Amino acid sequence: LWGVDRIHQIHDAMRQMLLDVDKDAHFDAVLVCPHRHRDRCQCRKPMPGMLRLGEQLFRGEAPTQSQLVVEIDGGAKVNWWNDKIEPSHPLDAMIGDRDSDMGAGWAQGVRCFKVNWNLGLASVTERILDQKDKGDPFNPLR
């Protein structure tokens, strides 16, 4: 696991890359799961805890700063056997290059777009903006 200083270095580098492209670019938030895979926390993908926190931050009642540094309550449990839930907004999407990304998106009910790691977001931008595009199929039990 990386320490806090390394996480800040990575995010600072990402910020600079954005600013190099657009001087007005910024992050609205940076959310980090500090746990190891074996910790089985609610915030590490494929669990949707980070997505649920993001939704709370931007669409609900934002938690206080002190609440942000404690364990994330994953909210409703995920039933991988049920049908995918409905998203809060039709343009909500999870874009990623791993099945764990798709699992988190599926558990949150959002459209999922799996991309090649070296193509990234640019390869699906048009699809994301098309509300009729339901995303890529994903079976959480596979």
PLM features: residue spans?
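Asp-based, Mg2+/Mn2+-dependent phosphohydrolase catalytic module
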Residues: 5-25, 38-142
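Short, basic/glycine-rich phosphate-binding loops at helix/coil junctions
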Residues: 29-37
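Short, solvent-exposed loop/turn segments at secondary-structure junctions
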Residues: 1-2
